[in-house]
């Protein structure tokens, strides 16, 4: 995971400095580092006032800025499931993937990025804006009290109801699991940005203050960043088991829901089902955590198993009479879009399964609910896992 982030950033820096470092990063499967394809993903031109601001800011960068992202704490990178990272890399043209970039979601994201020039992408990556909302939610948003989901709180009611239903549905200890939002607006909070910079990059406080002030100036002067609320900053959701994080304390069991990932599916017409389905998938990972499903193996096959199982668990809950009780036709329409966001890096340890395999796993979950002899009966998590593992060879053969 560290290699992915470091390579991504190095490509942008190489292009920014107009140097030739193609040989170093081509083997990572990343885009070749040139302004035409590493970051300048559109034909957008930078307005004169914005260009002047960026030129002024470039002169203030510290001498060692090229190596900045190499300092990210590897142990923190491992905490976040990069479920949607390849989609972000793909639309920003920061790394080449074999994924289909002509899906409804990537088309929408590309529209949101149509006015992002190479320099705008560069500063979003260099400063940490692409990462700070994610890790701030992971490490420091540790209470559900007063939280709202969505930029304007538009998903709060659905998320709150769905997590209550999930906790009643699955037979795990879940009272300690919290659901928290990921907001790009945290980039406006200087103190939070300073803290996040010191934690993620290991910077001294004066250095962190420099980057926080740079971000503040960028948010003020570059309208493309939407004051931190651009969906690219929060296009993610993930589950995390509790862990100790000294000197700050213990991070609780949690699910993080990004504004950007929910906004994207709402924009293309699936706002009625997307928040619930995404949350149900992430809750499935907590069911797995408590049943020791993950084990110690790190391989594409092991990750594919757990992700396909979470897909099946989500569909089982969504279609069950005692779960979300949604119409399967509507859920299936959403999942066919959701599973095509672009996870096709088959040799990556983060591989989630092909779209066809993921749909087969979801169909297994639906059929398990629909074919139950006693409608409304909920399988125990142990029973469901056993049934899924028995069906897995058939699912992956799709």
Where in the sequence are the language-model features?
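A metal-dependent hydrolase signature that marks the N-terminal structural subdomain at the beginning
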Residues: 32, 40-230
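Catalytic Zn2+-binding segment of zinc metalloproteases
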Residues: 282-298, 317-322
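Bacterial Sec-dependent N-terminal signal peptides
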Residues: 1-5, 15-48
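Post-HExxH zinc-binding segment in Zn-dependent metallohydrolases
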Residues: 300-327
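Long, well-structured alpha-helical subdomains associated
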Residues: 25-28, 319-398
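Extracytoplasmic/secreted envelope proteins and their assembly/folding machinery
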Residues: 160-167, 254, 280, 284, ...
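Short pre-active-site segment immediately N-terminal to the catalytic Zn-binding motif
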Residues: 261-277, 297-301
């Amino acid at each position: 995971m560290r290699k992915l982030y470091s390579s991504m950033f190095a490509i942008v820096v190489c292009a920014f400095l107009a140097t030739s470092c193609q040989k170093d990063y081509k083997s990572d499967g990343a885009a070749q580092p040139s302004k035409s394809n590493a970051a300048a993903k559109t034909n957008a031109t930078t307005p004169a006032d914005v260009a002047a601001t960026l030129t002024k800011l470039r002169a203030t960068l510290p001498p060692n800025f090229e190596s900045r992202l190499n300092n990210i704490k590897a142990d923190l990178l491992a905490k976040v499931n990069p479920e949607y990272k390849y989609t972000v890399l793909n639309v920003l043209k920061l790394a080449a993937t074999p994924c289909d970039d002509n899906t409804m979601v990537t088309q929408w994201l590309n529209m949101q990025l149509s006015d992002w020039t190479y320099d705008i992408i560069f500063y979003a990556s260099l400063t940490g804006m692409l990462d700070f909302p994610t890790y701030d939610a992971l490490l420091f948003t540790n209470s559900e009290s007063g939280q709202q989901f969505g930029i304007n709180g538009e998903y709060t009611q659905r998320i709150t109801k769905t997590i209550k239903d999930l906790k009643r549905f699955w037979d795990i200890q879940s009272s300690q699991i919290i659901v928290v939002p990921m907001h790009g607006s945290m980039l406006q909070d200087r103190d939070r940005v300073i803290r996040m910079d010191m934690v993620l990059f290991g910077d001294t406080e004066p250095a962190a203050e420099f980057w926080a002030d740079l971000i503040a100036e960028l948010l003020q002067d570059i309208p493309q960043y939407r004051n931190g609320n651009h969906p690219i900053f929060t296009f993610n959701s993930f589950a995390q088991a509790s862990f100790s994080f000294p000197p700050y304390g213990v991070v609780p069991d949690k699910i993080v829901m990004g504004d950007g990932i929910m906004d994207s599916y709402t924009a293309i017409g699936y706002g009625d089902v997307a928040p619930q389905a995404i949350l149900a998938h992430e809750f499935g990972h907590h069911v797995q955590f408590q049943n020791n499903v993950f084990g110690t193996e790190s391989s594409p096959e092991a990750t594919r198993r757990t992700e396909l199982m979470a897909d099946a668990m989500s569909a089982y809950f969504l279609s069950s009479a005692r779960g979300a009780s949604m119409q399967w036709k509507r859920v299936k329409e959403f999942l066919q879009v959701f599973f095509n966001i672009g996870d096709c890096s088959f040799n990556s340890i983060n591989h989630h399964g092909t779209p066809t395999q993921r749909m087969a796993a979801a169909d297994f979950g639906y059929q398990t609910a629909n074919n139950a002899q006693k409608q409304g009966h909920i399988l125990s998590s142990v029973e469901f896992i056993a049934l899924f593992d028995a069906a897995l060879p058939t699912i992956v053969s799709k």
